[in-house]
Amino acid sequence: MLRWQTAGESHGEALVAMIEGLPAGIHVTTEDIVGALARRRLGYGRGARMKFEQDKVRMLTGVRFGETIGSPVAIEIANTEWPKWTEVMSADPLDHDIPREGRNAPLSRPRPGHADLTGMRKYGFDDARPVLERSSARETASRVALGEVAKQFLEQTLGIRTVSHVLSIGGAGITDPQNAVLPKPEDLEALDASPVRTLDKTAEQQMIARIDEAKENADTLGGVIEVVVYGVPAGIGTYVESDRRLDAALASAVMGVQAIKGVEIGDGFLEAMRPGSQAHDEMAVGDDGRITRLSNRAGGIEGGMSNGQPIVVRAAMKPIPSIPKALRTVDVTTGEAAQAINQRSDNTAVPAAAVVAEAMVRLTIAQYVLEKFGGDSVAETKRNAESYVASWPEHMR
């Protein structure tokens, strides 16, 4: 069983990520992880932190000479700003009182749309600092690191490849997903070269203009992202229990990314507006004599199982709640009306969210692939998968 967990705070000494259940023999290096984390920092509209934040990575366990060895893989991502926060975020009690000002000023004006107020209520804090430190999207660096390990596993065993892109930001760009061309894995370099991670140059300019407008207005923007997975064989996931459906797991994984407010598979909500005769993917016999689909409205999943088509996961991200134009709130110390705290943040992080969602999709697919095929080594997993596909009648492959 593949399991993963992350630990660490936004301004703590380091983030730590661990993944357990991977087979031995996956080729993965520190350089791979560093490259993946660099992709997360890309994107027009990111804040100042992205300019000086360096992800210093250490592979702590589970990898030897660039290959997994079957034991849990642990990865540390050091916080280069830690020297500025050693007192504020000290794990141990301090011998002296810290002045309640500057970085250590109590954060008593919770932000609407953030975890601040509810987190303070839930855990009994009188300061939002402990809440925002863990709920911060900085934590997603850990998941991107683990997603890179999952990427290497999927590519090396079954040739499964994943790519993400941005459809729209702040309502600008490709607002009708039916008009979007699905990117291919070979488009990854071009996507990462785009300031907003799109292949559509017209949409790119529209999104950049909308971000510039938000900057001028001291505001933030959300958007819509899409992740596409190629090469997943039919039959990953199952219909026999609701919690084992692949689409349910993918939706949960992506919904768990900070600021994501909605997830759909394939045409999703558009399907609700179509008659049945126009909603489903009809089948035919292809030129090679095998069963093929005439469309992919289901997004590669039917009955909770992959059907062999590309898997398409789309998600909506809300605007970041740390807004320079501070929203109205209540100071929990005084009980009086106030303006919300404004922590350093981005105008938009939609391009980065696409990279994070990509990582979560990879982790989920890897989990379900291992559930289906098992294997203590990459070679064994690969043999099991090949045997499974070979067991189908020729016309069903």
Swiss-Prot record:
Question: Under which EC number(s) is this enzyme classified?
Answer: 4.2.3.5
Q: Which CDD domains match?
A: Chorismate_synthase
**Cofactor(s) needed by this chain:** FMNH2
Task: Give the pathway.
Answer: Metabolic intermediate biosynthesis; chorismate biosynthesis; chorismate from D-erythrose 4-phosphate and phosphoenolpyruvate: step 7/7
Q: Where does NADP(+) bind?
A: R40, R46
Enzymatic class = lyase
UniProt-listed InterPro entries: Chorismate_synth, Chorismate_synth_AroC_sf, Chorismate_synthase_CS
Q: Say what the protein does.
A: This reaction introduces a second double bond into the aromatic ring system.
Q: How does it assemble?
A: Homotetramer.
The entry's family comment says: Belongs to the chorismate synthase family.
Q: What is the recorded name of this protein?
A: Chorismate synthase
Q: Name the source organism.
A: Bifidobacterium adolescentis (strain ATCC 15703 / DSM 20083 / NCTC 11814 / E194a)
Q: Which gene encodes it?
A: aroC
